Amino acid sequence: MKNVLVRSAARALLGGGGRSYYRQLSTAAIVEQRHQHGGGAFGSFHLRRMSTLPEVKDQHSEEKKNEVNGTSNAVVTSYWGITRPKVRREDGTEWPWNCFMPWDSYHSDVSIDVTKHHTPKSLTDKVAFRAVKFLRVLSDIYFKERYGCHAMMLETIAAVPGMVGGMLLHLKSLRKFQHSGGWIKALLEEAENERMHLMTMVELVKPSWHERLLIFTAQGVFFNAFFVFYLLSPKAAHRFVGYLEEEAVISYTQHLNAIESGKVENVPAPAIAIDYWRLPKDATLKDVVTVIRADEAHHRDVNHFASDIHHQGKELKEAPAPIGYH
């Protein structure tokens, strides 16, 4: 065994590694001690463990190095198991939108009656109707025949009531431990639908800086005012929105007339509109305005229906919510 130790020391010194020499020397000593105690198998196992420790450390350091080098190109959200599903259109092409999925798209019911009007009866109805008419006069004075900008401003405001109503019903449901009858979902769907109208209009109209400032101011004022309004009287608030949607239908009808008369160019429909409303590939602005007008008519009916429920002295949860009713 002494000869083994001498040969090991010589190999280590010739290999130029004093550090390796001590490692091999200590390993050989351990083997000798184990063999003397009759533990040959365990000694060989210990030799293997001792000899691979530096390699394990090197392997771990290499893995860490690779991880550091790879983090710059890695998607952070994948760490949490959140990855974008591979979604495709019906024709097999890749779905390009993150803001909505194919199952969120739909065919708008353009057969809806766009001429319906709720005749004001009660005091709250008349106040709501007059308030909307006053706002309509102001918007007509400012935008005149700039239908695209008018629609963009309208959608910025119209997307607020559904969010406010849905949020307050959500808080009420949590506070009173009660179901909403589906009305939270219905109102939030309305808000999302109005937002998609706006995203479509932004593809067609590029607002100027002063129009952006006006939208920013109007949205801030309207959100807070409608929040208080809904707290005080949901009945009047829904009636107000119903009349607001009636005016939206009128505005889009005027927009359609301008397209048909040639005052407004009938440009190709944006790609987002084609996918959201499942329009044909050759759809035009006229098709987009037509489906948006139909959506507004549906919102009109939903909000007048909600106000009627309150007028009967009932809560919204007592009537079926029009879920999926764009």
From Swiss-Prot:
Claim: Membrane is one of the keywords in the record: yes
Cofactor: Fe cation
Function statement: Catalyzes the cyanide-resistant oxidation of ubiquinol and the reduction of molecular oxygen to water, but does not translocate protons and consequently is not linked to oxidative phosphorylation. May increase respiration when the cytochrome respiratory pathway is restricted, or in response to low temperatures.
Binding site for Fe cation 1: E155, E194, H197, E296
Origin superkingdom: Eukaryota
GO molecular function terms noted in the UniProt entry: alternative oxidase activity; metal ion binding; superoxide-generating NADPH oxidase activity; ubiquinol:oxygen oxidoreductase activity
Protein name: Alternative oxidase 3, mitochondrial
GO CC entries: mitochondrial inner membrane; mitochondrion
Classification via Pfam families: AOX
Family: Belongs to the alternative oxidase family.
Protein's gene: AOX3
Organism: Glycine max
